[in-house]
Amino acid sequence: YLYSGIYNRKREQRRKIMKSFIPKIIGAILNFIGLFSATYASKLALQLFSKPRGGMLTPKGRLFLDTGSKTTLYYNNLAIQTYHWKGSKETVLLAHGWESNSNRWRYEIEKLQKEDYDIIALDGPAHGASGSDTFNAILYSEFINVVSQKFKPTVFLGHSVGAMAVIFFLQKQTYSDVNKIVLLGAPSAFTGIMERYKKMMGYSKTIDKGIDTHIELKFGHPPSYFSTAKLIKNIEAHGLIFHDKKDPIIPYKDALEIEAQFKNAQLISTDGFGHSLKGDFITEEIIK
């Protein structure tokens, strides 16, 4: 048994080491391609960034989501899968994060149901049962707009990039029904996410600049424009910002940057909840 335990630990260590090398290997390949065509290599790098490798529904997840009524909406011929649990109180919209799906909210949904809230969850682009081959927060915000026009939520709850997409939607669209916004582990700026990706992959300066150029051509703005902290300053709704001080994915400083601009919001800092921010304390604060 002792030998087996040591062997398994060493195997896990080797697996983690190999996993950490894979991004650098892919980055080196794209850097090499960039020597011949920087435009093509940069486009591939952005496509790689935009394609989730997780977030599909499991059989167990499907069983839970089947307890809600399902409606498929569309944006530019892309399917938007929604799940609805009816209640008599305010309508709450739930937007999950990267490589996740609506089942991520199971615990929160069960708690909100007990309080008789009307609940709407949607699968983001290229996640769960929704359409698209690629994901970005701008497209996600358009999905949220379509869902909001139909179900008229007054409370928005977003996790990670789902929180960012909620703010992009509220800033861009004319939507006056929002009363409360809850942000869980939200990134303050797209540039921070992109810089961490570029560093992880080890991209050259040529590909680095090429990615930024592709983003501006595709979305009409440079990466620096897409900032939760900047875009949130004109939003009047009340808000709660949850962020763990030891979040390994989105730095805690992002929450401080958002709080500084979100005039009607309260920052609730946690310690030990990680990036997922799941637990009784979180849910109880949300439904107060």
Show which residues each predicted segment covers:
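An N-terminal hydrophobic leader/cap segment in hydrolases
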Residues: K19-T72
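Conserved alpha/beta-hydrolase
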Residues: S102, I109-G131
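Alpha/beta-hydrolase active-site loop
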Residues: T134-P153
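Gly/Ala-rich beta-loop-alpha elbow adjacent to hydrolase catalytic centers
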Residues: G158, G162-V166
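Hydrolase active-site cap/lid region
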Residues: Q173-H221
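Short beta-strand/loop motif that positions the catalytic acidic residue
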Residues: I235, I241-H243, D247
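Conserved alpha/beta-hydrolase "acid-adjacent" motif
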Residues: P248-D254
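Catalytic histidine-centered segment of alpha/beta-hydrolase-like enzymes
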Residues: F273-I282
